[in-house]
Amino acid sequence: MSQQTEPATPLLSRSMNAVIIAQFFSAFGDNALLFATLALIKQLVYPDWSQPFLQMGFVAAYIILAPFVGQIADSFSKGQVMMFANTLKLAGALLICVGGNPFLGYTLVGVGAAAYSPAKYGILGEITRGDQLVKANGLMEASTIAAILTGSVAGGVLADWNIYGALSICAVAYGIALGANMLIPRLNAARPGQPWHPVQMASSFFSACRVLWRDGDARLSLVGTSMFWGAGVTLRFLLVLWVPHALGITDNATPTLLNAMVAVGIVVGAGAAAKLVTLDSVRRCLPAGFLIGVVVVIFTLQHNLMSAYSLLILLGALGGFFIVPLNALLQERGKASVGAGNAIAVQNLGENGAMLLMLGLYSLVVKLGVSVIAIGIGFGVLFALAIALLWVWLILAKRRDRSASAE
């Protein structure tokens, strides 16, 4: 008797479409809100060095909640977790809209984002199969970057028109994301019945950290993605100061347009990675990571807007090619060991720890009066060296493994 094969689930299923739409509007709100709030604190005459603290409150929420959000994502239906997280984001946006402390409001958005991240990536492994996971990650990253592109531009352009109008549009975006969350079919919890004692949850989380760190592929993903996002968020704030210094432009829109060029490039790079890189060939992405640092140095020395646009598109393409395979690799390794939700929570701890460290250093050197050009050059050189060291470390580890297997 011949066995019947189960029909393949199409990549763009109802569930996937709902997840992608929710992700777009949620990420749109995050990015538009950042630039609208930056314009607000500029209007309120906060010092330049305080700008990174807006993002630092956001990422601190990720770090503090890291031991708990992975278990939350795996203990409940991930669609419901995403809905709850977007509700928190909406509350944070409304707090800023009504004149509340902008740092507190954006930190509340960070709490929502911390809960949202493990669920949004973890759900991909539940609604796709096999090789579709890399393609699904490509769609997720493309949606995210499209949201960064449009959200960043909208935040800056609308803030030049009316800051509180821009903030209100951010709240509307979170409301649309909530509506899309309601279209995600209710899925079974991946790991129900886990204990809810904080000490046990923290112990379980750090156990997951150890398990993933001992896995060579997971370790590569954790280190690579942490370095990338730490550098990426620092570049975003660097552009805010670089534009008036290098280009002589003082509006809110130009830094957001330049950030949008990075987003355009990441869409291209993510698409290329989905076609050219598989889970078995993830290390092909490392040269792109090294070149990111090189391009940052070249970009920092520019004084022409068009060349800046071109270089940032290239920078984004390299970033997309670098990050998408690493994300897919961690989800695959995590799903097989500690659960996709816990794996993404561990990843968030690494990424946001790197962001907090780099933003803190950036704020310090700005306060010390270091030139923004010198900051950009040093930033690019250090990133390229870090990726080069990671690359050499992997080559040496591979040689050791071959020598051990030959004995």
Swiss-Prot record:
Q: Which residues are listed as membrane-spanning? A: 18-38, 53-73, 91-111, 139-159, 163-183, 229-249, 257-277, 286-306, 310-330, 343-365, 375-395
SUPFAM superfamilies in UniProt = MFS general substrate transporter
Under Pfam families, the record lists:
MFS_1
A GO cellular component term found in this entry reads: plasma membrane
**Where can this protein be found?**
Cell inner membrane
- Keywords recorded for this protein, A-Z: Cell inner membrane, Cell membrane, Lipid transport, Membrane, Transmembrane, Transmembrane helix, Transport
SS bonds (residue pairs): none
Extract the NCBIfam families matched here: PRK11195.1
Question: What family is reported?
Answer: Belongs to the major facilitator superfamily. LplT (TC 2.A.1.42) family.
Q: What is this protein called?
A: Lysophospholipid transporter LplT
Q: Which organism is it from?
A: Pectobacterium carotovorum subsp. carotovorum (strain PC1)
Q: Tell me the gene name.
A: lplT
